[in-house]
């Protein structure tokens, strides 16, 4: 790995829960490459799609049984759930945008059942949540399940923190 760092023209560090690149990590990178720019990136929510009753299916417009960009429909308290190996970034992103009533973690690659959907709805109602939010990765596993509350999938994308400097670096490289 150090050899690869020494050859890099730029380094992009993916932040997962951290607010910024630590001084220790920057110092470690600089041991192997003293000149290249270091950029920070993180996964952020770019929008939401509503998961419709009846499950997920291909649609003519390329959707997956959901209403495209339902971001405006999301107001109120939220129960967030997912089956990710490291769910903290997802939950943090939801908490930045909404009043987070509760979170429910499932094991990575969880296969959801109607019992899960019923339990999530019960927990959500018990803590005053008005809707459920999950990841697109999890949404594709919710086909045929019915929730007693609106359920949305968060679309995620990578965002570079100093986008102008990153764009300038990329443009100057060509």
Label the model's feature ranges.
Residues 1-131:
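C-terminal accessory "lid"/substrate-recognition subdomains
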Residues 21, 141-142:
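Switch/connector loops and helix/strand junctions flanking conserved nucleotide-binding motifs
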Residues 26-35, 142-161:
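A short, gly/pro- and small-residue-rich
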Residues 46, 107-110, 149-174:
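Short, flexible loop segments at boundaries between secondary-structure elements
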Residues 81, 144, 167-171:
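Long, hydrophilic "mature protein body" segments
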Residues 87, 136-141:
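Short, polar loop motifs at secondary-structure junctions
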Residues 113-116, 144-146, 166:
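Short secondary-structure transition/capping segments
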